[in-house]
Amino acid sequence: MLKRKVRYLLLIVVVFTGIILSVEAIMRFQLNKNVDYYLKFFDKHKDNIENMYDPLNIKQIPYSTIDQLYTKRQSEAEPIDWDKFAYVNYITDFEYLCNTLIQFRKLNDSGSKAKLLALVTDTLVNKSKENKEVEALLNKIKSVSDRVAVTEVGSVIQPNDHTPWSKSLTKLAIFNLTDYERIIYMDNDAIIHDKMDELFFLPSYVKFAAPISYWFVTADDLRTVSTDTKKLFKTNKLDPIEKKLASRVKNSLEIYNHLPNLPQHFYSKSMNFIIDIDGFQKSDNKVNFATHLMVIKPDVTMANDIRDNILPRYLKAKEEYDTDLINEELYNFKELIYYQFKIFRKIQYLFKPSVLILPYTKYGLLTKSIDDKRQKDLLKNAILGYERKEKDDLIQDAKFIHFSDYPLSKPWFYSNADDIQCSKKYSISDENCQLWKSLYKEYLESRAICQVN
């Protein structure tokens, strides 16, 4: 009798398990069909779709489109309230005060009308009361323009961390700057060649935009995504896409669905993560968002979540910094697409995308790329998977160039550009070498404004 009951219970368990697995299989099949349908739908019907956005891709926006959106906004009758927009630096150490002064002076001289906000840690502010040099540099920053504001913030320091990035989580204070409609955050170990006011006028639904970490892309990756793009869309030419986007901007039509996709190759081999996001690692993307320049719509809810939930976890973690937090917790490509599609399936016409990828040659160029033959092809175009007839002119076209030449030190540790030598192993040419060195020379010459008596 007992054996019969056991067999009966086992049979029930087997049948129940079979039903669950069958239901899951049907749901997976149906979800895969939905994914395939909408991938084709948005590609085929994008010219006729209004107020519905592709949830299955992360979009790249060309510089020409960014500039046209800004020109369009300037032509409108309603005046721009520049008090709602700010360029932002954060400063944790004395060595970085001069960099902020240089950047703010350049933005002011190039005609930017936005606010210039320096977030200075409380420890550095307190030091200014004793150190006349710190006080003098803070005063110089304030004197750049009446649009400059210096705000004190609390230091966020990784315990038992002695790396140069131990204070990098202080950067997360930028997400709480809710007095502003949109901010452009900039690491200040970078050189600015022109104002970037156009970035304030990305589509209103975009909460976060940044270049990507293009330096992880290999020559093989470039060939693969170029081929994949041709297969999917019959062409990988960017020029007709830019022309189409220009027409839509001019006619006040939605542009999102016409923007180039970030090739799927960079974040997943398949779209299966849409079915089960927990079964996929967040950190196995080939590229992520770079965080040395970010365009952000500050948000109270996100700021509170960072402060109350995310930051406490990261302060306990070892060697986890601002870039990790932003790409793993806030704007992970797989999770973005997973939740975008989840929302879209429930409320199609209410879904709006929240991120864009900025062209890295314009807003995210690293100095080391300028004279590194391994990255030469990467700098021909800033939209991955696509090609343009006219190539970007490296330094002349770049607005923001980040000093990153490990194992070389940051430029303020040198007194003369002649002390810095190009790589013998990876240098592209003498011309590129001189271009690269010219940035160090430009920076070192600009430090003259930081001298205090």
From Swiss-Prot:
Top-level taxon in the UniProt lineage: Eukaryota
Q: Which InterPro entries match?
A: GNT1/Glycosyltrans_8, Nucleotide-diphossugar_trans
Q: Where is this motif: DXD?
A: 187-189
Query: Which residue ranges does the entry give as Lumenal-facing topology?
Result: 30-453
Glycosylation-annotated residues: N108, N126, N176
Entry GO terms, CC: Golgi membrane; vacuolar membrane
Entry keyword set: Glycoprotein, Golgi apparatus, Membrane, Signal-anchor, Transferase, Transmembrane, Transmembrane helix, Vacuole
On the Cytoplasmic side, which residues? 1-8
**What Gene3D superfamilies does the record point to?**
Spore Coat Polysaccharide Biosynthesis Protein SpsA, Chain A
Intracellular or extracellular location(s): Golgi apparatus membrane; Vacuole membrane
Q: What EC number is given for this enzyme?
A: 2.4.1.-
Its membrane topology: Single-pass type II membrane protein
Q: Which GO terms describe its molecular function?
A: transferase activity
Q: What class of enzyme is it?
A: transferase
Q: Mark the transmembrane ranges.
A: 9-29
Q: Please give the function described in this protein's UniProt entry.
A: N-acetylglucosaminyltransferase involved in the Golgi-specific modification of N-linked glycans.
Q: Which PANTHER family match?
A: GLYCOGENIN SUBFAMILY MEMBER
- Spell out the family assignment given in the record's similarity comment: Belongs to the GNT1 family.
For this entry, the protein name equals: Glucose N-acetyltransferase 1-B
